[in-house]
Amino acid sequence: MESRKREDHLRKGSEVSPYESLLAGSISGAVARAVTAPLDTIKIRLQLQRSAFRSRVSVTTVVKDLLKNEGAIALWKGNVPAEILYVLYGAAQFTTYSSISRWLSHLSDTSGFNLPSSAHSLVSGTGAGVVSTLVTYPFDLLRTRLAANSEKKLLSMSGTAREIISSEGFTGLFAGIKPAMLSISTTTGLMFWSYELVRETLGDRDIPFKEGICGFIAGATSKGITFPLDTIRKRTQMYKILYNSAKRVGAFRLLADIVANEGVLGLYKGFGISVLKTSPTSAVSLFVYEYSLAAIQRINRKTLD
C-alpha cells in the first residue's frame, strides 16, 4: 500500500492513461486554485505597477489598500475565470505531459532514441506548457483583467470578455500570447524537470508530504528563472489600460521600456509574493495529482477485479 502511495507517476516510463491524467489533473487544478487565489490577486497588482523599482508599493500597502477600498472579497477578483483556467490547465497540462512522456518512451523502445530522465521530463513539461497555454489563454487574460480592476464594483467575466472583443476584436482575448507561450512553457518544463530531479535525489526515503516538498522546490526554482517573462506577459495583457494605448507592442519593445523606465529590477516586481504563491501552488498541484491518480488507479483496478 505504501509503495503505491509513494509511486512517482511523472517519472520516465510511468504508464498513465489519458483518462486518468485528465481526471487527476482537473482535481489538482481546482484544489490548487482554491488554496492560492488571494496570493495571485496580490501578485498581479504588484506586477502591474509602472513606477521605478525603488518607489514600488510594498505587499503590505497593496493588501491594506485593497482591503480598505475594495473589501476582502476583492482578494478573489477574477476567481471564476481563474478556477476555470486552473481546472482546464491542470487537465491539459498533466494529460499532455503523460502523453508526450509515453510517446518518448515508445520512441526509445522502437528507435533507440533515448533521452536522459532529466531531459525527458524537461521536454514533456515544455510540450505540456505549450498545449495548456493554447487551451486556456483567454481565461488567463480575463483573470488578469479582473484581478487588476481596482474598482469596488466587481466586473463579470462575460462582460469583460464582451468589452475586450468590442474594443480590441476577438484577437484581443489572445493579447500577449507569444510572451505567455514562452513564459509558461519554459516555466512548466523547468518545474517538471526540477520535480523529477529532487525526487531522484531523495530516492526511496520515506518523507512525509514528499510530493509536496518536491513540488514546492520545483515551483520556486522554475519561477525564479522565468519571472521576468511572466511580468512581460502580464504587462502585455494589460497594455491598453496601463499605457492608455490601443496600439500593441512586441515583447522585446516592452522589455526595453520596462528596463529603461523602471530598471532591471522592474522585471521582478511582485517576485516575493509570486514565489510565495507559485511554490505552494506547485506543491499542492503535484501532491494532489499524485494522490488523486493513485486513488483513481486503485478504483479502476477494483472495478476490473
Swiss-Prot record:
GO terms for cellular component: mitochondrial inner membrane. It is a multi-pass membrane protein. One of its GO terms (biological process) is mitochondrial thiamine pyrophosphate transmembrane transport. The keyword Transport applies. It is found in: Mitochondrion inner membrane. The keyword Transmembrane applies. It holds the Pfam family Mito_carr. The chain crosses the membrane at residues 16-32, 84-100, 122-142, 169-193, 213-229, 270-287. SUPFAM superfamilies: Mitochondrial carrier. One of its GO terms (molecular function) is thiamine pyrophosphate transmembrane transporter activity. Belongs to the mitochondrial carrier (TC 2.A.29) family. Mitochondrial transporter that mediates uptake of thiamine pyrophosphate (ThPP) into mitochondria. This is Mitochondrial thiamine pyrophosphate carrier 1. It comes from Scheffersomyces stipitis (strain ATCC 58785 / CBS 6054 / NBRC 10063 / NRRL Y-11545). The lineage of its organism: Eukaryota, Fungi, Dikarya, Ascomycota, Saccharomycotina.
